[in-house]
Regions:
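Multi-bladed beta-propeller domains
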Residues: 1, 30-62, 77-78, 88-112, ...
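Residue-level detector of Asp-centered blade-edge/turn motifs that repeat once per structural unit
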Residues: 8-9, 68-69, 112-113, 157-158
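Hydrophobic helix-coil surface modules that form long, contiguous segments used
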Residues: 15, 23-25, 35-45, 243, ...
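A conserved hydrophobic secondary-structure block that centers on an alpha-helix together
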Residues: 1-9, 16
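Structural motif
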Residues: 22-29, 81-86, 126-132, 171-177
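Hydrophobic beta-strand positions that form the internal "hydrophobic ladder"
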Residues: 12-15, 73-74, 117, 162
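Serine-hydrolase catalytic core recognition
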Residues: 16, 151-462
């Protein structure tokens, strides 16, 4: 049960209640004078409850509150398959949907006069985040910003001015101001990049779609070398977290990898960065497609991405794969559960056995190890160690505070027991899950580059 949201007159409150298995959410109305409560909304998901603006079963609270009339409650739900705003009239006991479409609503702010919501949304393209105003009475949504990229907005107290943190694909975040009006114009305030940074022509990767083997559209970032400089080899990057978006039109959270991808392209490689199944921004079905099988549909999207690269003229026998955290896990599953698909892979800070990872994360997707052992077994790389064929590089910080170092130690021991020879482990003694030292990042990516250059270029020319 999450914290109560009180009406201004203090006579009633609402809160959301979650089942322990995270498959049900109830929003309840509490009469504070009688102590009685009634159900406003019930959401059930055979996989797990989630999505933008929707609370977790832990302390993470979602969108929930009152309009100024002390009668109308607002909340978000994935009822239609995408997270949208809903309103409930507590007097008339009536619920209606305010926003709709195949896009997601984020970061709701109620206007002072309680007549509008300000939201962030990817309505124009899954890879954009624009700032919109939703007129509650008219049920009309207008763009305040509309440019490709990400507009992270804070309203001034009088709601007349916007402070905007904006970026696009090859431009880091900068601060702008704008008037709060439809299709506003931004005024740039900061110029944060250095001469050294600006001296390099950072690429704007194309955001492309290709068809998965189930005919669903898969979004990805595509980095391509100039015609004539391509070496017909490619690298697939797997972002971390699972529920995260990286095939978008703004500056990546993976800025180091973005720079590394530019280096790869400088040397003739093509790079594909896929928003695989379970990535953020694409609705409920996309989010839950990995239920009971991590390394299933999400890994298949990378195999389909490899086929897409082949359609662009890439040699399908010269495609490597790498990623960190969840991306490292997918890399391990690619190398171990689909042997022969990739000649090489680099797995950074990877989970090797989900039964040893934190319960809060895994219980949503795989249920519990004691009640659903099959889901854990088919989703854990350590059970496929005997299948290793390609060259595998594993890299892990010894003081990892997220994916414990024991994960990579156990898989290493399993490789030793199986007499596997085509693997290496690079240990970083002072690093946790997110590396801090520049020399560690350099060492890590030097090793990864050398792996791809050796396995995809040198060996192909012998």
């Amino acid at each position: 049960m999450h914290s109560l949201k009180f009406a201004k007159n203090q006579s009633k409150a609402v809160c959301d209640v979650r089942s322990y298995d995270n498959k049900d959410r109830w929003i309840i109305l509490i009469d504070l004078t009688t102590g009685l409560f009634t159900e406003i909304d019930h959401q059930h998901d055979e996989a797990w409850i989630g999505g933008p603006g929707i609370s977790g079963w832990n302390a993470d609270e979602g969108t929930l509150g009152w309009l100024n009339d002390d009668q109308t409650v607002y909340f978000q739900s994935e009822k239609t398959g995408y997270s949208h705003i809903y309103l409930h009239d507590t007097a008339r006991k009536y619920t209606w949907q305010l926003t709709e479409g195949k896009w997601e609503v984020y970061d709701i702010v109620l206007s002072k006069d309680s007549k509008s919501f300000y939201i962030s949304a990817n309505r124009s393209h899954p890879g954009d985040r624009n700032f919109l105003r939703v007129d509650i009475a008219a049920q009309k949504t207008d763009n305040i910003t509309s440019k490709e990229g990400y507009h992270q907005v804070v309203l001034s107290p009088d709601e007349k001015t916007l402070a905007i943190r904006f970026s696009d694909k090859n431009t880091p975040w900068e601060l702008y101001t704008a008037v709060n009006t439809t299709n506003t114009t931004k005024n740039r305030v900061t110029y944060s990049t250095t001469k050294e940074f600006n001296s390099y022509q950072w690429r704007k990767p194309d955001v492309v779609t290709f068809k998965g083997s189930d005919e669903k559209d898969i979004y990805a970032r595509l980095y391509q070398p100039k015609i004539g400089s391509a070496n017909k080899a490619a690298v697939i990057f797997v972002h971390g977290a699972g529920y995260l978006q990286n095939a978008h039109n703004y500056w990546s959270n993976y800025h180091r990898e973005y720079m590394f991808h530019n280096l790869l392209v400088d040397n003739g490689f093509t790079v594909l960065d896929i928003d695989y199944r379970a990535s953020e921004g694409y609705g409920r079905d996309y989010r839950t497609a990995i239920y009971r099988h991590m390394g299933g549909r999400d890994l298949q999207d990378h195999l389909d991405g490899k086929d897409y690269l082949a359609s662009l003229g890439i040699d399908s026998t010269r495609v490597g794969i790498y990623g960190g955290s969840y991306g490292g896990f997918i890399t391990l599953m690619a190398m171990l559960s689909t042997p022969g698909e990739f000649p090489c892979g680099a797995a950074l800070r990877s989970v090797t056995d989900w039964a040893h990872y934190n319960h809060e994360y895994t219980s949503n997707i795989l249920n519990y190890p004691d009640t659903d052992p099959e889901a854990y077994r088919k989703s854990s790389p350590i059970y496929f160690a005997e299948n290793l064929q390609g060259k595998l590089l594993m890299l892990h910080g010894m003081v990892d505070d997220n994916v414990q170092f024991q994960d990579v130690v156990r898989l290493s021991q399993r490789f030793i027991e199986l007499n596997k020879e085509n693997w290496e482990l690079a240990v970083f003694p002072i690093e946790a899950h997110g590396f801090k030292e520049s020399y560690s990042w350099y060492d890590e990516y030097r090793r990864i580059y050398e792996l791809f250059y050796t396995e995809l270029i040198l060996k192909s020319t012998k």
